[in-house]
Structure formats: structure tokens, C-alpha cells
Amino acid sequence: MDKPRKENEEEPQSAPKTDEERPPVEHSPEKQSLEEQSSEEQSSEEEFFPEELLPELLPEMLLSEERPPQEGLSRKDLFEGRPPMEQPPCGVGKHKLEEGSFKERLARSRPQFRGDIHGRNLSNEEMIQAADELEEMKRVRNKLMIMHWKAKRSRPYPI
């Protein structure tokens, strides 16, 4: 009788091991790379859309996707749908129509942009002097560019 008991005791030991006791099964390199990519994608999504902001951003994203297509609108309808511009784009507008040189217009516009100068208390004379320096630098630069252009093209062979 002692022998059957010993056999019974040995059988549970030879029984299949549980998940905890099994050595980890190694995945193929392809599966590992896929898992790494998916974890990288999740981390990048978390960086762009943290979980706290997702409930706030979701309605805006959904609204932006639900816009009806505007392909059927004519050019006239498109321009009527836009709000009027407050100021014309750069290079177009009233400053082209104003009379006077660049220096005079700069001196006149100084009070409007007093806050844009960031702590520099410049008088009108200083502003005009700075404008003169800028114009002189432009002239010198243009002369150098012309001289370079002429020197480059006056040779019988390219450099």
C-alpha cells in the first residue's frame, strides 16, 4: 500500500505546470517589433492627446469632420460667406497712398506703434537717423550685388 501512495504523490508533480511555473514563451522578432510599434504609437498618441484633454477635444474634432462639402458653391458665394477683412494684406493699402518719404511716414506712425517698440524710448530724430542707416545699408548691399553680378558674368568661362 505504500507504493500506490508514493505513485499518487509523484503524479501531481509530473502533471502539467501552471502558467506561473512555465518559462516565458519567446515571441518571434516580427511579433516583438509589432508590439514595440504599437506601444510607440500609443505613447505618441498620449503625448499629442493627453487623457485629460480628450473629452474637451473630441466634440471639436467631431464638429470639424461633420462640415458639409463646399464644392458646389460659386466664387461669388464664397466671397459673400467670408467676413470682411479689417486691414488689407501686407503691401496693399493706405500706406501706399500716403504721401512723403519712408522717413516721414515712419516718424508720423510712431505714436501708433509706441507699444511695439518694447521699451525703447526713441525720439523722432533717432527714428529718422535709424531709417537713414537702413537705407544706406540697402544701397550698399544693392551695389555689392550688382558688382558681384557684373564680375561673375564678365569672364569668358564660368567659375
From Swiss-Prot:
Primary localization class, coarse: nucleus
Protein name in UniProt: Transcription elongation factor A protein-like 1
Subcellular location: Nucleus
Bias (Basic and acidic residues) ranges: 17-34, 64-80
Keywords: Nucleus, Transcription, Transcription regulation
Gene: TCEAL1
Family to which the UniProt record says this protein belongs: Belongs to the TFS-II family. TFA subfamily.
Region entry Disordered, spans: 1-99
Pfam family, one: BEX
GO CC, any one term: nucleoplasm
Composition skew (Acidic residues), residue ranges: 37-54
Species this protein is from: Macaca mulatta
Function recorded in the entry: May be involved in transcriptional regulation. Modulates various viral and cellular promoters in a promoter context-dependent manner. Does not bind DNA directly.
